[in-house]
Amino acid sequence: MKIEEKIKQKYLYSKNFNFIKIIYFFIQFFKSKFKYKKSYSFGSQDLITEKFFKNKKKGIYLDVGCFHPVIGNNTYKLYKKGWEGINIDIDFHSIDLFNFFRKNDENIQIGVSDKSGENDMFFFHNRSAINTLNPIRGKNAKEVKKIKIDTLNNVIKKTKFANSKIDFLTIDVEGYEMNVLKGFDIKKYSPDLIVIEFMDLENKTDDIYKIEFYKQNLNKILNSELYNYMIHNNYSLVNWTFLDLVWVSNKFKKINS
């Protein structure tokens, strides 16, 4: 038996606590806390994207409803890998953070919809990830303001990615996802992977904070406008994590089969 194994047998595998075992536990604790940060997303969506794009060193992402550049972010892992893209949010504080932490990206403050102009914005508080353009989702908002909106197509045209293929699209806009998609040329930009938050707007809860993933209904997803839209545009639903649905392009699946 090697010396290392003898030490483990004597001290680490002992039923009694000892100094070496305590030091070992502390090392493991701090390694798990600081060294092995695996996911930044709220529901580990970035682990799916990391595996999906494991062989792609450079790529382009589009994050609508980005909110924070690191915490709960689906694209930060890709950014660290060398990717770049467009981050969009209605909150200028969020865009300030992105401009500081994600200098290689194009970070834009605007509301995204299926039309250009102005729209009511439903505020729960200024720095809230649940502020929304959706009147049903925002029925108990504390304040309503008019904000500038534009289509995703128009927003992209004003960036350096206007004629680029989008590899990864993620949308989290609190029940306004279909409006965003309708203003996006999905055939032109043809993302290989799309992550979209799914909101059951028929959920009658008066407390927006009580909408949880375990209250989602698979039948409602399969009969939703979003599902039919994505199937019609040649995407397959391949995963469901937290509140997000994960879609893969059938073209990508065929090429990589």
Residue ranges and their predicted role:
Residues M1-S257:
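Phosphate/nucleotide-binding beta-alpha loop and adjacent structural elements of enzyme active sites
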